[in-house]
Swiss-Prot record:
It comes from Salmonella schwarzengrund (strain CVM19633). Keywords: Arabinose catabolism, Carbohydrate metabolism, Isomerase, Manganese, Metal-binding. It catalyses: beta-L-arabinopyranose = L-ribulose. This is L-arabinose isomerase. GO terms for biological process: L-arabinose catabolic process to xylulose 5-phosphate. The gene is araA. Catalyzes the conversion of L-arabinose to L-ribulose.
């Protein structure tokens, strides 16, 4: 079972009574056929549910009102099978607070050249019915997506499925609770921000709990529960000699298991699906949570270090969006560079907390090594390299008057040399279009040093995310040129200034 099983998307057909009962009967028949086929063949992440025809203002308004109050409804897909005068949609769209997609399709793929008549033309009017609907969306400044293509086309299936992921993610975000264990890393700017503005814009709440509250739960974990989790570690990872039974770091592994169980219990009891820690606030914990955080991220929790609640929330959102897709998604940090003409590289990592969903190894190494930062006992962690191939890194920043999402398209590569003295998980990548352009654009746009790294999602996913939440996006990819990028930032400043 996945999060998508908790939601459904309503399929709404727009028409009108002008064409008579027989035409509406055929419209309904076509709609039933299309919805059944999409649910059976399109591999959509959640179920489509056909709703009654929308043929009058009252019917349409009732559907939109019901969608708002049905917790299972993630959004609406609208198909204008015939012409549907758009003034009928104004009241409904004005109250709709769920994501909306127009599926610009028609029942037949090919025109019946020899038999086409006006009855056929009146029945199959998506071509101009969709344009009428599009006008009222533009006139009302109604954010909505459009997918054009025949309902049997696999590309259309893929695009509808991607939008569904956004719709479900948006509903999950409205319920998201972010727990901060302690506050920000002292004096750091980009990890701070306006939590009230974030809740207004995205819906997620951010609150702080004392580390002592967590410690109480951690200390209540039984030895039996720890032993069971250690057995899971033994079967899932390659343990170094120091971490095995009778190894001199075995107790550190047991303490890491205690912290993991305590953190998970605390998060479950509070209904949290994202959290932060900071190495400056660990009072009562014997080690910085490393292994615990890595495993919780793999289970779908959002996380970021040093109190960075925006990145923690973004990671959870992207975890939901990517559920069931190939490839992983993780907290990440641009750590250090390799400068080589024509082969500039970025080594990404963090002190400990990189999600094993991006690991290339089937069994990452579980080890315990010294960590000077934090002043605690040596923490347990998983060590691995990252899968190669196309990926993205994304950062959500607070500019005071708006949020900006930065996305850099990257290409992860194999580490050319072993890293015998680097005791943390890592990712190595080439930034698009090149490191000087990418880093300068990122810095000029205010991108954070913390990011969400993903093999599972791509730039199109993040564009949709920005659109569905009505936030600015700054893209850095192979098409980026710094002069044009700077101009776009200036234009955005004016545009969003007018929107205030």
């Amino acid at each position: 079972m996945t999060i998508f099983d908790n939601y459904e998307v309503w399929f709404v057909i727009g028409s009108q009574h002008l064409y008579g009962a027989e035409t509406l009967r055929q419209v309904t028949q076509h709609a039933e056929h299309v919805v059944n086929a999409l649910n059976t063949e399109a591999k959509l992440p959640c179920k489509l549910v056909l709703k009654p025809l929308g043929t009058s203002p009252d019917e349409i308004t009732a559907i939109c009102r019901d969608a708002n109050y049905d917790d299972r409804c993630a959004g609406l897909v609208v198909w204008l099978h015939t012409f549907s005068p758009a003034k009928m949609w104004i009241n409904g769209l004005s109250i709709l607070n769920k994501p909306l997609l127009q599926f610009h399709t028609q029942f037949n793929a090919a025109l019946p050249w020899d038999s086409i008549d006006m009855d056929f033309m009146n029945l199959n009017q998506t071509a101009h019915g969709g344009r009428e609907f599009g006008f009222i969306g533009a006139r009302m400044r109604q954010q909505h997506a459009v997918v054009t293509g025949h309902w049997q086309d696999k590309e259309a299936h893929t695009r509808i499925g991607a939008w569904m992921r956004q719709a479900v993610s948006k509903q999950d975000t409205r319920q998201l609770k972010v727990c901060r264990f302690g506050d920000n890393m002292r004096e750091v700017a980009v990890t701070d921000g306006d939590k009230v503005a974030a809740q207004i814009k995205f819906g997620f709440s951010v609150n702080t709990w004392a580390v002592g509250d967590l410690v109480q739960v951690v200390n209540s974990i039984s030895d039996g529960d720890i032993n069971a989790l250690i057995d899971e570690y033994e079967s899932s990872y390659t343990l170094t000699p120091a971490t095995r039974i009778h190894g001199d770091k075995r107790q550190n592994v047991r303490e890491a298991a205690r912290i993991e169980l305590g953190m998970k219990r605390f998060l479950e009891q509070g209904g949290f699906h994202a959290f932060t820690t900071t190495f400056e606030d660990l009072h009562g914990l014997k080690q910085l949570p490393g292994l615990a955080v890595q495993r919780l991220m793999q289970q779908g929790y959002g996380f970021a270090g040093e109190g960075d609640w925006k990145t923690a929330a973004l990671l959870r959102i992207m975890k939901v969006m990517s559920t069931g897709l190939q490839g992983g998604t993780s907290f990440m940090e641009d750590y250090t560079y390799h400068f080589e003409k024509g082969n500039d590289l970025v080594l990404g990592s963090h002190m400990l907390e990189v999600c094993p969903s991006i690991a290339v190894e089937e069994k990452p190494i579980l080890d315990v090594q010294h960590l000077g930062i934090g002043g605690k006992e040596d923490p347990a962690r998983l060590i691995f390299n990252t899968q190669t191939g196309p990926a993205i890194v994304a950062s959500l920043i607070d500019l005071g008057d708006r949020y900006r999402l930065l996305v850099n398209c990257i290409d992860t590569v194999k580490t050319p040399h072993s890293l015998p003295k680097l005791p943390v998980a890592n990712a190595l990548w080439k930034a698009q279009p090149d490191l000087p352009t990418a880093s300068e654009a990122w810095i000029l746009a205010g991108g954070a040093h913390h990011t969400v790294f993903s093999h599972a999602l791509d730039l199109n996913d993040m564009r949709q995310f920005a659109e569905i939440h009505d936030i600015e996006i700054a893209v850095i990819d192979n098409d980026t040129r710094l002069p044009a990028f700077k101009d776009a930032l200036r234009w955005n400043e004016v545009y969003y200034g007018f929107k205030r």
